[in-house]
Every structure is written in structure tokens, then in C-alpha cells.
């Protein structure tokens, strides 16, 4: 059962990663490519903020 769930999850994620936007939204493709990295910027911002206040 677990093997089936893992395989199913992999298939869904691989389809999600490889899918293309509809032609009407092709203009936003570069923005969509960058969107998964945005949370990393917030994580790094926390370190910059703490460095600015001397890691109190």
C-alpha cells in the first residue's frame, strides 16, 4: 500500500513539475519559474535581520 502511494505521489509531482502553462499565461512563465525560490529569500532575510540587530 505504501509503495502504491509513493509511486502515485511521484507521478503526480513529476506531472506537476513538467507541466506547461496555458498559452494565454505564457507571459508569466519567467515569474512562475522564480516563485519556488521566494521562501528561501525570506529565510535569508531573517539572518540579515538578525545580523543587523547583532543576533540578540
From Swiss-Prot:
Chain segments annotated as transmembrane: 35-55
One Pfam family here: PsbK
Coiled-coil segments on the chain, per record: none
Presence of keyword Aminoacyl-tRNA synthetase: no
Compartment(s): Plastid, Chloroplast thylakoid membrane
Keyword 4Fe-4S: no
Superkingdom of origin organism: Eukaryota
Principal location class: plastid
Topology in membrane: Single-pass membrane protein
Primary role: One of the components of the core complex of photosystem II (PSII). PSII is a light-driven water:plastoquinone oxidoreductase that uses light energy to abstract electrons from H(2)O, generating O(2) and a proton gradient subsequently used for ATP formation. It consists of a core antenna complex that captures photons, and an electron transfer chain that converts photonic excitation into a charge separation.
Subunit structure comment from the entry: PSII is composed of 1 copy each of membrane proteins PsbA, PsbB, PsbC, PsbD, PsbE, PsbF, PsbH, PsbI, PsbJ, PsbK, PsbL, PsbM, PsbT, PsbX, PsbY, PsbZ, Psb30/Ycf12, at least 3 peripheral proteins of the oxygen-evolving complex and a large number of cofactors. It forms dimeric complexes.
HAMAP family: PSII_PsbK (MF_00441)
Protein name stated in the entry: Photosystem II reaction center protein K
Organism: Welwitschia mirabilis
Amino acid at each position: 500500500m505504501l509503495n502504491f502511494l509513493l509511486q502515485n505521489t511521484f507521478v503526480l509531482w513529476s506531472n506537476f513539475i513538467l507541466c506547461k502553462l496555458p498559452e494565454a499565461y505564457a507571459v508569466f512563465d519567467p515569474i512562475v519559474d522564480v516563485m519556488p525560490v521566494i521562501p528561501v529569500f525570506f529565510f535569508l532575510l531573517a539572518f540579515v535581520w538578525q545580523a543587523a540587530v547583532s543576533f540578540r
